[in-house]
Amino acid sequence: MVEPLLDGLVLGLVFATLGGLFYAAYQQYKRPNELGG
């Protein structure tokens, strides 16, 4: 069956998206004065 492969692909996409969001938030939190905020 292809279900395990699809599950792995979905989990990979979800973790990649969450990782990107957390990374962007961390970058903005690390340098909050760059945007004048």
UniProtKB/Swiss-Prot annotation:
This protein's major location comes to membrane
Q: Which domain of life is it from?
A: Bacteria
Under the heading InterPro entries, the entry gives: Cyt_6/f_cplx_su5, Cyt_6/f_cplx_su5_sf
Q: Could you mention a single GO BP entry for this protein?
A: cytochrome complex assembly
Could you list this entry's UniProt keywords, alphabetically sorted. Answer: Electron transport, Membrane, Photosynthesis, Thylakoid, Transmembrane, Transmembrane helix, Transport
Transmembrane domains' residue ranges: 5-25
Q: How does it assemble?
A: The 4 large subunits of the cytochrome b6-f complex are cytochrome b6, subunit IV (17 kDa polypeptide, PetD), cytochrome f and the Rieske protein, while the 4 small subunits are PetG, PetL, PetM and PetN. The complex functions as a dimer.
**Is Ribonucleoprotein one of the keywords?**
no
Q: What is the lineage of its organism?
A: Bacteria, Bacillati, Cyanobacteriota, Cyanophyceae, Nostocales
Q: What is this protein called?
A: Cytochrome b6-f complex subunit 5
Q: What does this protein do?
A: Component of the cytochrome b6-f complex, which mediates electron transfer between photosystem II (PSII) and photosystem I (PSI), cyclic electron flow around PSI, and state transitions. PetG is required for either the stability or assembly of the cytochrome b6-f complex.
Question: What is the membrane topology here?
Answer: Single-pass membrane protein
- Look up the record and report any one GO term of the cellular component aspect: plasma membrane-derived thylakoid membrane
Localization (cell)? Cellular thylakoid membrane
Q: Name one GO molecular function term.
A: electron transporter, transferring electrons within cytochrome b6/f complex of photosystem II activity
Is-annotated flag, keyword Transmembrane?
Answer: yes
User: To which protein family does this belong?
Assistant: Belongs to the PetG family.
